[in-house]
């Protein structure tokens, strides 16, 4: 009697076959130890960020006795937990946002064209895999890579496009920004 695969397992494979070229970045790898009666058992923990460079990103952590296996587990978990982030002009965020996770606190700001990715370490990996080209980011809290990545993804999950905000409020996109002000003419001296 063969067991039926649980729901959700099949979708994972289909999504990878759809032609979504996922790129993954290894953020950190760490040797960890479990203390047992006979001494210490060493293993490796990996943190990986995965994205399609078109607005989808996810992160995952994996642990195993060998490094490649830990990276594989982390990559699988990252693919399962991907989120979609709306991007302005396909290159930056729609608005400034803050994200927190544990002691990790990050501030993300939209940037004009040509700025590039101004972000440190783990945050840079998230933006590169996400496909954002212009952003300014600052980590104010913990420097722990896990907390920085989780805070960054938490901030990105709050990002909303003007169209989605307008539909949620039952308004038109033009109503969100209000009437345009005419530029004040300089006074003659």
Swiss-Prot record:
Annotated segments matching region Disordered: 164-189
Matches recorded under Gene3D superfamilies: 3.30.160.20, 3.30.230.10
Residue span(s) of domain S5 DRBM: 22-85
Protein's GO biological process: translation
GO function terms (MF aspect): rRNA binding; structural constituent of ribosome
Cross-referenced Pfam families: Ribosomal_S5 (PF00333), Ribosomal_S5_C (PF03719)
GO CC annotations on file: small ribosomal subunit
Keyword terms, alphabetized: Ribonucleoprotein, Ribosomal protein, RNA-binding, rRNA-binding
Known partners and oligomeric status: Part of the 30S ribosomal subunit. Contacts proteins S4 and S8.
UniProt remark on domains: The N-terminal domain interacts with the head of the 30S subunit; the C-terminal domain interacts with the body and contacts protein S4. The interaction surface between S4 and S5 is involved in control of translational fidelity.
Family that this chain belongs to: Belongs to the universal ribosomal protein uS5 family.
UniProt-listed NCBIfam families: rpsE_bact
Protein name: Small ribosomal subunit protein uS5
Organism: Acidiphilium cryptum (strain JF-5)
Lineage: Bacteria, Pseudomonadati, Pseudomonadota, Alphaproteobacteria, Acetobacterales
Protein encoded by which gene: rpsE
